[in-house]
Curated annotation (Swiss-Prot):
Function of the protein: Inhibits tax-6/calcineurin A phosphatase activity and thereby negatively regulates calcineurin-mediated functions. Plays a role in modulating temperature-dependent calcium responses in AFD neurons and in addition, also negatively regulates thermotaxis in a tax-6-dependent manner in AFD neurons. In response to changes in intracellular calcium levels may also regulate nuclear translocation of transcriptional regulators such as crtc-1. May play a role in regulating body size. Plays a role in male tail tip morphogenesis.
Location of the region described as Required for tax-6 interaction in the Swiss-Prot/TrEMBL record: 176-181
Protein name (record): Calcipressin-like protein
Tissues showing expression: Expressed in lateral hypodermal cells, marginal cells of the pharynx, vulva epithelial cells, ventral and dorsal nerve cords and commissures and various neurons in the anterior and posterior regions. Expressed in male tail structures including the diagonal muscles, sensory rays and spicules. Expressed in PHC neurons and most tail neurons and support cells of the phasmid neurons. Also expressed in pharyngeal muscle, head neurons, excretory canal cells and hypodermal seam cells.
Domain of life from the UniProt record: Eukaryota
Name of the encoding gene: rcan-1
Any one of the GO CC terms: cytoplasm
GO molecular function: calcium-dependent protein serine/threonine phosphatase regulator activity; nucleic acid binding; protein phosphatase 2B binding; protein serine/threonine phosphatase inhibitor activity
Record organism: Caenorhabditis elegans
Recorded family membership: Belongs to the RCAN family.
Site (May be required for inhibiting calcineurin activity) location in chain: S129, S133
Length: 207
């Protein structure tokens, strides 16, 4: 009795899982795959039309996928009820001496979320060549002018006119004026300081 109860509970669990998986009508398959299809169906237009009429009598607007390499045909219906009716008709049906077999095909769900890589966000897309229209409200930034020291500029200009004096800072009531009087470097002044040479130490032979 214990074994029977466990077996019944196992069946109930299995049935419960089966019911939960097909609780929605959208989970049922709406397509079948017909196997052992004669080669004449793929080559002869009339045989293909006769084969298609087996399913168009159930539903007119259906889709066929003729898989010649596998000798199979996938038939997609609009509802699971029509797919079930077509499977019952085709299963064991003899067509041009070949017994057809059919089984349900897995339902294909078209997802709106693409698994492909998406383009970059729009805030920097206008910087990519070729440039496109910038976003609304975007304004061109102005570059800051170069910072030039007046003292350095005046010193550079004064180097070209040695004989002329130039005023670095204008004097006012609180600070005196700064005037630079350039002068030429005397010719006899050495350009560099001479460093004394270190004598070479004597060798043992010289001693």
């Amino acid at each position: 009795m214990v074994a029977d109860n466990s077996e019944k509970s196992t069946k109930s669990v299995a049935n419960g899982s089966l019911i939960s998986t097909v609780s929605s009508k959208d989970d049922l398959p709406n397509a079948i795959i017909v196997t052992q299809v004669p080669e004449d169906v793929f080559d002869n237009k009339q045989d293909k039309a006769n084969f298609s009429s087996l399913f168009t009598q159930i539903e007119k607007d259906i889709h066929f996928d003729f898989l010649r390499s596998f000798r199979r045909v996938r038939v997609i219906f609009s509802s699971p009820e029509n797919a079930t009716a077509a499977k019952l008709i085709v299963q064991g049906f003899s067509f041009k001496g070949h017994e057809l077999k059919a089984f349900f095909a897995q339902r294909i769900y078209m997802s709106a979320n693409s698994q492909m890589l998406s383009p970059p966000p729009l805030e920097k897309q206008f910087l990519i060549s070729p440039p496109c229209s910038p976003p609304v409200g975007w304004e061109q930034t102005k570059d800051m002018p170069p910072v030039v020291c007046n003292f350095d500029l005046m010193a550079r200009l004064a180097s070209f006119a040695i004989d002329e004096k130039y005023e670095v800072h204008n004097g006012d009531e609180l600070t005196p004026a700064i005037i630079v009087h350039p002068c030429e470097t005397p010719i006899d002044v050495p350009s560099a300081i001479e460093m004394p040479r270190t004598p070479r130490p004597s060798s043992p032979c010289e001693q």
